[in-house]
Amino acid sequence: MVLSQRQRDELNRAIADYLRSNGYEEAYSVFKKEAELDMNEELDKKYAGLLEKKWTSVIRLQKKVMELESKLNEAKEEFTSGGPLGQKRDPKEWIPRPPEKYALSGHRSPVTRVIFHPVFSVMVSASEDATIKVWDYETGDFERTLKGHTDSVQDISFDHSGKLLTSCSADMTIKLWDFQGFECIRTMHGHDHNVSSVAIMPNGDHLVSASRDKTIKMWEVQTGYCVKTFTGHREWVRMVRPNQDGTLIASCSNDQTVRVWVVATKECKAELREHEHVVECISWAPESSYSSISEATGSETKKSGKPGPFLLSGSRDKTIKMWDVSTGMCLMTLVGHDNWVRGVLFHSGGKFILSCADDKTLRVWDYKNKRCMKTLNAHEHFVTSLDFHKTAPYVVTGSVDQTVKVWECR
Protein backbone atom coordinates (compact mmCIF):
# COMPACT_ATOMS: atom_id res chain seq x y z
CA MET A 1 0.00 0.00 0.00
CA VAL A 2 1.57 3.30 -1.13
CA LEU A 3 0.88 6.55 0.69
CA SER A 4 0.73 9.88 -1.13
CA GLN A 5 3.23 12.56 -0.13
CA ARG A 6 0.56 14.38 1.90
CA GLN A 7 -0.51 11.20 3.74
CA ARG A 8 3.12 10.40 4.47
CA ASP A 9 3.65 13.89 5.87
CA GLU A 10 0.51 13.59 8.06
CA LEU A 11 1.61 10.20 9.37
CA ASN A 12 5.11 11.46 10.17
CA ARG A 13 3.73 14.45 12.06
CA ALA A 14 1.27 12.23 13.98
CA ILE A 15 4.13 9.85 14.92
CA ALA A 16 6.29 12.80 16.00
CA ASP A 17 3.44 14.14 18.16
CA TYR A 18 2.94 10.69 19.71
CA LEU A 19 6.67 10.31 20.50
CA ARG A 20 6.90 13.75 22.04
CA SER A 21 3.68 13.65 24.09
CA ASN A 22 4.64 10.25 25.52
CA GLY A 23 8.10 11.38 26.58
CA TYR A 24 10.24 9.63 23.96
CA GLU A 25 12.42 12.77 23.62
CA GLU A 26 15.48 11.16 22.01
CA ALA A 27 13.49 9.16 19.51
CA TYR A 28 11.46 12.31 18.79
CA SER A 29 14.46 14.48 17.98
CA VAL A 30 16.07 11.76 15.81
CA PHE A 31 12.80 11.08 13.99
CA LYS A 32 12.11 14.80 13.50
CA LYS A 33 15.56 15.24 12.00
CA GLU A 34 15.38 12.19 9.72
CA ALA A 35 11.86 12.95 8.55
CA GLU A 36 12.84 16.59 8.04
CA LEU A 37 9.88 17.95 9.99
CA ASP A 38 9.51 21.57 10.97
CA MET A 39 7.07 21.34 13.90
CA ASN A 40 5.38 24.54 15.12
CA GLU A 41 2.61 25.41 17.62
CA GLU A 42 -0.20 25.67 15.08
CA LEU A 43 0.66 22.43 13.31
CA ASP A 44 1.16 20.65 16.64
CA LYS A 45 -2.42 21.32 17.73
CA LYS A 46 -3.74 19.82 14.51
CA TYR A 47 -1.87 16.56 14.98
CA ALA A 48 -2.31 16.20 18.76
CA GLY A 49 -3.50 12.67 19.56
CA LEU A 50 -4.13 11.91 15.89
CA LEU A 51 -2.27 8.58 15.88
CA GLU A 52 -4.31 7.22 18.83
CA LYS A 53 -7.56 8.44 17.24
CA LYS A 54 -6.78 6.71 13.94
CA TRP A 55 -5.69 3.57 15.77
CA THR A 56 -8.93 3.25 17.78
CA SER A 57 -11.16 4.10 14.83
CA VAL A 58 -9.53 1.34 12.75
CA ILE A 59 -10.42 -1.21 15.44
CA ARG A 60 -13.96 0.16 15.67
CA LEU A 61 -14.41 0.00 11.90
CA GLN A 62 -13.01 -3.53 11.75
CA LYS A 63 -15.63 -4.62 14.29
CA LYS A 64 -18.36 -2.89 12.27
CA VAL A 65 -17.16 -4.58 9.06
CA MET A 66 -17.27 -7.99 10.76
CA GLU A 67 -20.80 -7.31 12.05
CA LEU A 68 -21.98 -6.27 8.59
CA GLU A 69 -20.31 -9.29 6.98
CA SER A 70 -22.10 -11.64 9.37
CA LYS A 71 -25.43 -9.91 8.66
CA LEU A 72 -24.76 -10.22 4.93
CA ASN A 73 -24.00 -13.93 5.32
CA GLU A 74 -27.23 -14.40 7.28
CA ALA A 75 -29.16 -12.58 4.56
CA LYS A 76 -27.55 -14.77 1.87
CA GLU A 77 -28.45 -17.87 3.87
CA GLU A 78 -32.04 -16.63 4.19
CA PHE A 79 -32.14 -16.17 0.44
CA THR A 80 -30.79 -19.62 -0.43
CA SER A 81 -32.77 -21.50 2.23
CA GLY A 82 -36.05 -20.28 0.75
CA GLY A 83 -36.36 -17.28 3.01
CA PRO A 84 -39.14 -14.73 2.73
CA LEU A 85 -37.94 -13.85 -0.78
CA GLY A 86 -38.63 -17.40 -1.94
CA GLN A 87 -42.12 -18.85 -1.71
CA LYS A 88 -44.87 -16.91 0.03
CA ARG A 89 -45.51 -18.23 3.51
CA ASP A 90 -48.73 -18.54 5.42
CA PRO A 91 -48.59 -15.95 8.27
CA LYS A 92 -49.16 -18.87 10.68
CA GLU A 93 -45.70 -20.06 9.68
CA TRP A 94 -43.87 -16.74 9.86
CA ILE A 95 -40.80 -16.93 12.06
CA PRO A 96 -38.33 -14.32 13.36
CA ARG A 97 -35.70 -13.35 10.78
CA PRO A 98 -32.31 -11.72 11.24
CA PRO A 99 -31.15 -9.05 11.56
CA GLU A 100 -33.18 -7.57 14.43
CA LYS A 101 -35.49 -4.63 13.68
CA TYR A 102 -34.36 -2.74 16.81
CA ALA A 103 -31.72 -3.18 19.50
CA LEU A 104 -32.86 -1.06 22.43
CA SER A 105 -30.47 0.01 25.13
CA GLY A 106 -31.24 1.88 28.34
CA HIS A 107 -30.99 -0.68 31.11
CA ARG A 108 -27.83 -0.51 33.22
CA SER A 109 -27.81 -4.20 34.18
CA PRO A 110 -28.93 -7.51 32.63
CA VAL A 111 -32.50 -7.65 31.29
CA THR A 112 -34.44 -10.35 33.16
CA ARG A 113 -37.84 -10.39 31.40
CA VAL A 114 -39.51 -8.96 28.29
CA ILE A 115 -43.26 -9.02 27.55
CA PHE A 116 -45.62 -7.51 24.98
CA HIS A 117 -48.63 -5.43 26.00
CA PRO A 118 -51.85 -7.30 25.09
CA VAL A 119 -53.43 -4.26 23.39
CA PHE A 120 -51.05 -1.37 22.62
CA SER A 121 -47.92 -1.44 20.46
CA VAL A 122 -45.64 -1.36 23.49
CA MET A 123 -43.55 -3.90 25.30
CA VAL A 124 -42.10 -3.88 28.79
CA SER A 125 -38.71 -5.00 30.07
CA ALA A 126 -37.54 -5.76 33.61
CA SER A 127 -33.93 -5.63 34.73
CA GLU A 128 -31.46 -6.29 37.50
CA ASP A 129 -31.08 -2.48 37.64
CA ALA A 130 -34.36 -2.50 39.70
CA THR A 131 -36.34 -0.72 36.96
CA ILE A 132 -39.08 -1.58 34.50
CA LYS A 133 -38.92 0.15 31.10
CA VAL A 134 -41.68 0.69 28.53
CA TRP A 135 -40.83 0.77 24.79
CA ASP A 136 -42.77 1.20 21.56
CA TYR A 137 -41.88 -1.88 19.51
CA GLU A 138 -43.11 -0.40 16.21
CA THR A 139 -40.92 2.72 16.33
CA GLY A 140 -38.18 1.53 18.69
CA ASP A 141 -38.81 4.54 20.95
CA PHE A 142 -38.21 4.45 24.69
CA GLU A 143 -41.35 5.62 26.50
CA ARG A 144 -40.79 5.62 30.27
CA THR A 145 -39.26 3.98 33.34
CA LEU A 146 -41.21 2.60 36.31
CA LYS A 147 -39.23 2.88 39.54
CA GLY A 148 -40.13 1.49 42.94
CA HIS A 149 -38.32 -1.79 43.47
CA THR A 150 -35.06 -1.66 45.41
CA ASP A 151 -33.45 -4.77 43.92
CA SER A 152 -33.46 -6.78 40.69
CA VAL A 153 -36.93 -7.02 39.04
CA GLN A 154 -37.36 -10.72 38.23
CA ASP A 155 -40.65 -11.02 36.36
CA ILE A 156 -43.56 -8.95 35.01
CA SER A 157 -47.08 -9.80 33.84
CA PHE A 158 -50.10 -7.96 32.37
CA ASP A 159 -53.76 -8.72 32.99
CA HIS A 160 -55.76 -9.51 29.82
CA SER A 161 -56.86 -5.86 29.38
CA GLY A 162 -53.34 -4.48 29.79
CA LYS A 163 -54.56 -1.95 32.37
CA LEU A 164 -52.69 -3.64 35.20
CA LEU A 165 -49.05 -4.69 35.33
CA THR A 166 -47.57 -6.72 38.14
CA SER A 167 -43.88 -7.10 38.95
CA CYS A 168 -41.84 -9.08 41.46
CA SER A 169 -38.36 -8.57 42.76
CA ALA A 170 -35.38 -9.84 44.72
CA ASP A 171 -36.44 -7.16 47.26
CA MET A 172 -39.05 -9.81 48.32
CA THR A 173 -42.04 -7.71 47.20
CA ILE A 174 -44.68 -7.87 44.49
CA LYS A 175 -45.96 -4.61 43.05
CA LEU A 176 -49.15 -3.83 41.17
CA TRP A 177 -49.00 -0.93 38.69
CA ASP A 178 -51.81 1.03 37.06
CA PHE A 179 -50.56 0.90 33.46
CA GLN A 180 -52.68 3.89 32.45
CA GLY A 181 -51.29 6.34 35.01
CA PHE A 182 -48.03 4.39 35.49
CA GLU A 183 -48.44 4.55 39.28
CA CYS A 184 -47.68 1.78 41.75
CA ILE A 185 -51.06 1.02 43.37
CA ARG A 186 -50.04 -1.70 45.79
CA THR A 187 -47.03 -3.48 47.23
CA MET A 188 -47.44 -7.01 48.58
CA HIS A 189 -45.21 -8.54 51.24
CA GLY A 190 -45.31 -12.18 52.31
CA HIS A 191 -42.47 -14.11 50.71
CA ASP A 192 -39.36 -14.71 52.83
CA HIS A 193 -36.89 -14.58 49.94
CA ASN A 194 -36.30 -13.41 46.35
CA VAL A 195 -39.63 -13.46 44.41
CA SER A 196 -38.64 -14.98 41.07
CA SER A 197 -41.90 -15.10 39.15
CA VAL A 198 -45.33 -13.53 38.99
CA ALA A 199 -48.41 -13.91 36.76
CA ILE A 200 -51.90 -12.41 36.78
CA MET A 201 -54.61 -15.09 36.58
CA PRO A 202 -56.81 -15.06 33.42
CA ASN A 203 -59.87 -13.72 35.32
CA GLY A 204 -57.81 -10.77 36.57
CA ASP A 205 -58.99 -11.16 40.21
CA HIS A 206 -55.90 -12.94 41.50
CA LEU A 207 -52.21 -13.21 40.82
CA VAL A 208 -49.71 -15.96 41.60
CA SER A 209 -46.09 -15.62 42.63
CA ALA A 210 -43.17 -18.02 43.09
CA SER A 211 -40.17 -17.54 45.32
CA ARG A 212 -36.79 -18.76 46.44
CA ASP A 213 -38.57 -19.50 49.76
CA LYS A 214 -39.85 -22.68 47.95
CA THR A 215 -43.51 -21.57 47.97
CA ILE A 216 -46.08 -20.35 45.46
CA LYS A 217 -48.61 -17.82 46.73
CA MET A 218 -51.92 -16.58 45.36
CA TRP A 219 -52.94 -12.98 46.04
CA GLU A 220 -56.20 -11.06 45.70
CA VAL A 221 -55.66 -8.16 43.29
CA GLN A 222 -58.35 -5.97 44.90
CA THR A 223 -57.01 -6.16 48.47
CA GLY A 224 -53.43 -7.37 48.15
CA TYR A 225 -54.16 -10.21 50.60
CA CYS A 226 -52.44 -13.57 50.25
CA VAL A 227 -55.29 -16.10 49.96
CA LYS A 228 -53.44 -19.37 49.22
CA THR A 229 -49.98 -20.87 49.60
CA PHE A 230 -48.92 -23.91 47.54
CA THR A 231 -46.12 -25.94 49.15
CA GLY A 232 -44.33 -29.00 47.80
CA HIS A 233 -41.24 -27.87 45.91
CA ARG A 234 -38.05 -28.72 47.76
CA GLU A 235 -35.96 -25.87 46.34
CA TRP A 236 -36.21 -22.38 44.84
CA VAL A 237 -39.33 -22.06 42.61
CA ARG A 238 -38.20 -20.39 39.37
CA MET A 239 -41.38 -19.74 37.41
CA VAL A 240 -45.14 -20.01 37.80
CA ARG A 241 -47.70 -19.79 34.97
CA PRO A 242 -51.52 -20.28 34.96
CA ASN A 243 -53.21 -22.21 32.15
CA GLN A 244 -55.69 -20.52 29.77
CA ASP A 245 -58.79 -20.91 31.94
CA GLY A 246 -57.01 -20.41 35.27
CA THR A 247 -57.99 -23.80 36.73
CA LEU A 248 -54.38 -25.04 36.84
CA ILE A 249 -51.02 -23.47 37.54
CA ALA A 250 -47.65 -24.90 36.56
CA SER A 251 -44.39 -24.25 38.37
CA CYS A 252 -40.76 -25.27 37.92
CA SER A 253 -37.92 -25.37 40.37
CA ASN A 254 -34.28 -25.90 41.26
CA ASP A 255 -35.45 -29.30 42.58
CA GLN A 256 -35.44 -30.34 38.86
CA THR A 257 -39.21 -30.90 38.73
CA VAL A 258 -42.21 -29.29 37.10
CA ARG A 259 -45.41 -29.37 39.13
CA VAL A 260 -49.00 -28.78 38.08
CA TRP A 261 -51.45 -27.63 40.76
CA VAL A 262 -55.25 -27.52 40.89
CA VAL A 263 -56.06 -23.94 41.89
CA ALA A 264 -59.36 -24.71 43.63
CA THR A 265 -57.99 -27.40 45.97
CA LYS A 266 -54.26 -26.48 46.11
CA GLU A 267 -53.45 -30.14 45.39
CA CYS A 268 -50.46 -31.08 43.25
CA LYS A 269 -52.04 -32.84 40.24
CA ALA A 270 -48.75 -33.86 38.59
CA GLU A 271 -45.06 -33.90 39.36
CA LEU A 272 -43.05 -34.09 36.14
CA ARG A 273 -39.53 -35.32 36.70
CA GLU A 274 -37.22 -36.09 33.80
CA HIS A 275 -34.95 -33.05 33.70
CA GLU A 276 -31.43 -33.56 35.04
CA HIS A 277 -30.82 -30.01 36.24
CA VAL A 278 -32.66 -26.87 37.42
CA VAL A 279 -35.84 -26.22 35.39
CA GLU A 280 -35.73 -22.53 34.42
CA CYS A 281 -38.90 -21.95 32.42
CA ILE A 282 -42.33 -23.32 31.53
CA SER A 283 -45.09 -22.43 29.08
CA TRP A 284 -48.58 -23.80 28.43
CA ALA A 285 -49.51 -24.86 24.90
CA PRO A 286 -52.34 -22.76 23.40
CA GLU A 287 -55.38 -24.75 22.30
CA SER A 288 -54.58 -23.78 18.70
CA SER A 289 -51.58 -26.13 18.89
CA TYR A 290 -53.40 -29.20 20.29
CA SER A 291 -54.13 -30.81 16.92
CA SER A 292 -50.52 -30.32 15.73
CA ILE A 293 -49.21 -31.75 19.01
CA SER A 294 -51.49 -34.80 18.88
CA GLU A 295 -50.43 -35.40 15.28
CA ALA A 296 -46.73 -34.97 16.11
CA THR A 297 -46.73 -37.14 19.22
CA GLY A 298 -49.43 -39.64 18.38
CA SER A 299 -50.81 -38.93 21.84
CA GLU A 300 -54.12 -40.68 22.31
CA THR A 301 -57.25 -38.61 22.62
CA LYS A 302 -58.62 -39.31 26.08
CA LYS A 303 -62.09 -40.67 26.83
CA SER A 304 -63.27 -37.07 27.23
CA GLY A 305 -62.35 -36.68 23.56
CA LYS A 306 -60.21 -33.61 24.25
CA PRO A 307 -56.41 -33.77 24.09
CA GLY A 308 -54.08 -31.98 26.49
CA PRO A 309 -53.40 -29.89 28.38
CA PHE A 310 -49.76 -29.73 27.22
CA LEU A 311 -46.83 -27.98 28.83
CA LEU A 312 -43.30 -27.03 27.76
CA SER A 313 -40.31 -26.83 30.07
CA GLY A 314 -36.75 -25.61 29.52
CA SER A 315 -33.85 -26.56 31.75
CA ARG A 316 -30.21 -26.04 32.62
CA ASP A 317 -29.71 -29.58 31.26
CA LYS A 318 -29.89 -27.74 27.85
CA THR A 319 -33.09 -29.52 26.78
CA ILE A 320 -36.71 -28.57 26.15
CA LYS A 321 -39.40 -31.10 27.08
CA MET A 322 -43.05 -31.33 26.10
CA TRP A 323 -45.46 -32.91 28.58
CA ASP A 324 -49.00 -34.25 28.49
CA VAL A 325 -50.24 -33.01 31.86
CA SER A 326 -53.21 -35.41 32.01
CA THR A 327 -50.93 -38.47 31.92
CA GLY A 328 -47.71 -36.96 33.29
CA MET A 329 -45.87 -38.33 30.24
CA CYS A 330 -42.93 -36.58 28.59
CA LEU A 331 -43.94 -36.54 24.90
CA MET A 332 -40.62 -35.34 23.47
CA THR A 333 -37.24 -33.85 24.27
CA LEU A 334 -35.69 -31.23 21.99
CA VAL A 335 -31.90 -31.17 22.01
CA GLY A 336 -29.81 -28.46 20.36
CA HIS A 337 -29.02 -25.60 22.72
CA ASP A 338 -25.41 -25.55 23.95
CA ASN A 339 -26.19 -23.98 27.33
CA TRP A 340 -28.97 -23.38 29.87
CA VAL A 341 -32.42 -22.89 28.31
CA ARG A 342 -33.94 -19.70 29.73
CA GLY A 343 -37.15 -19.14 27.79
CA VAL A 344 -39.56 -21.32 25.83
CA LEU A 345 -42.99 -20.80 24.25
CA PHE A 346 -45.28 -21.88 21.44
CA HIS A 347 -45.45 -19.98 18.16
CA SER A 348 -48.94 -18.47 17.88
CA GLY A 349 -49.54 -20.57 14.74
CA GLY A 350 -49.17 -23.68 16.92
CA LYS A 351 -46.69 -25.57 14.71
CA PHE A 352 -43.41 -24.28 16.11
CA ILE A 353 -41.69 -23.74 19.43
CA LEU A 354 -39.42 -20.78 20.16
CA SER A 355 -36.67 -20.86 22.76
CA CYS A 356 -33.78 -18.76 24.01
CA ALA A 357 -30.73 -19.76 26.01
CA ASP A 358 -27.39 -18.92 27.54
CA ASP A 359 -25.76 -20.00 24.25
CA LYS A 360 -26.78 -16.47 23.07
CA THR A 361 -29.25 -17.84 20.52
CA LEU A 362 -32.94 -17.66 19.73
CA ARG A 363 -34.12 -20.92 18.16
CA VAL A 364 -37.20 -22.01 16.22
CA TRP A 365 -38.15 -25.69 16.46
CA ASP A 366 -40.29 -27.72 14.10
CA TYR A 367 -41.44 -30.06 16.86
CA LYS A 368 -43.29 -32.41 14.51
CA ASN A 369 -39.89 -33.46 13.13
CA LYS A 370 -38.10 -32.77 16.44
CA ARG A 371 -35.56 -30.54 14.73
CA CYS A 372 -34.22 -27.03 15.18
CA MET A 373 -35.19 -25.30 11.93
CA LYS A 374 -33.63 -21.89 12.60
CA THR A 375 -30.96 -20.50 14.90
CA LEU A 376 -30.54 -16.75 15.31
CA ASN A 377 -27.41 -15.42 16.98
CA ALA A 378 -29.53 -13.02 18.96
CA HIS A 379 -27.28 -11.30 21.50
CA GLU A 380 -23.70 -10.70 22.64
CA HIS A 381 -24.42 -12.49 25.93
CA PHE A 382 -26.93 -14.91 27.55
CA VAL A 383 -30.51 -14.52 26.25
CA THR A 384 -32.67 -14.46 29.37
CA SER A 385 -36.20 -14.02 28.06
CA LEU A 386 -38.43 -13.98 24.98
CA ASP A 387 -42.02 -13.19 24.10
CA PHE A 388 -44.07 -13.76 20.95
CA HIS A 389 -46.80 -11.26 20.10
CA LYS A 390 -50.27 -12.81 20.01
CA THR A 391 -51.38 -11.01 16.84
CA ALA A 392 -48.56 -8.88 15.37
CA PRO A 393 -45.55 -10.54 13.66
CA TYR A 394 -42.96 -9.71 16.33
CA VAL A 395 -40.72 -11.49 18.79
CA VAL A 396 -38.83 -9.68 21.54
CA THR A 397 -35.74 -10.92 23.43
CA GLY A 398 -33.84 -9.63 26.46
CA SER A 399 -30.26 -10.35 27.45
CA VAL A 400 -27.47 -10.08 29.98
CA ASP A 401 -25.88 -7.71 27.39
CA GLN A 402 -28.42 -5.15 28.76
CA THR A 403 -30.29 -4.80 25.46
CA VAL A 404 -33.80 -5.63 24.33
CA LYS A 405 -34.17 -6.71 20.69
CA VAL A 406 -37.24 -6.68 18.48
CA TRP A 407 -37.37 -9.28 15.69
CA GLU A 408 -39.77 -9.16 12.78
CA CYS A 409 -41.39 -12.40 11.63
CA ARG A 410 -41.96 -13.07 7.96
From Swiss-Prot:
Residues 1-102, 388-410 are annotated as: Interaction with NDEL1. Residues 1-38 are annotated as: Required for self-association and interaction with PAFAH1B2 and PAFAH1B3. It is found in: Cytoplasm, Cytoskeleton; Cytoplasm, Cytoskeleton, Microtubule organizing center, Centrosome; Cytoplasm, Cytoskeleton, Spindle; Nucleus membrane. CDD domains: WD40 (cd00200). Residues 1-66 are annotated as: Interaction with NDE1. Gene3D superfamilies: 1.20.960.30, YVTN repeat-like/Quinoprotein amine dehydrogenase. WD repeats lie at residues 106-147, 148-187, 190-229, 232-271, 274-333, 336-377, 378-410. Pfam families: LisH_PAC1 (PF24951), WD40 (PF00400). One of its GO terms (cellular component) is 1-alkyl-2-acetylglycerophosphocholine esterase complex. One of its GO terms (molecular function) is dynein complex binding. Can self-associate. Component of the cytosolic PAF-AH (I) heterotetrameric enzyme, which is composed of PAFAH1B1 (beta), PAFAH1B2 (alpha2) and PAFAH1B3 (alpha1) subunits. The catalytic activity of the enzyme resides in the alpha1 (PAFAH1B3) and alpha2 (PAFAH1B2) subunits, whereas the beta subunit (PAFAH1B1) has regulatory activity. Trimer formation is not essential for the catalytic activity. Originally the subunits of the type I platelet-activating factor (PAF) acetylhydrolase was named alpha (PAFAH1B1), beta (PAFAH1B2) and gamma (PAFAH1B3). Now these subunits have been renamed beta (PAFAH1B1), alpha2 (PAFAH1B2) and alpha1 (PAFAH1B3) respectively. Belongs to the WD repeat LIS1/nudF family. This is Platelet-activating factor acetylhydrolase IB subunit alpha. The gene is PAFAH1B1.
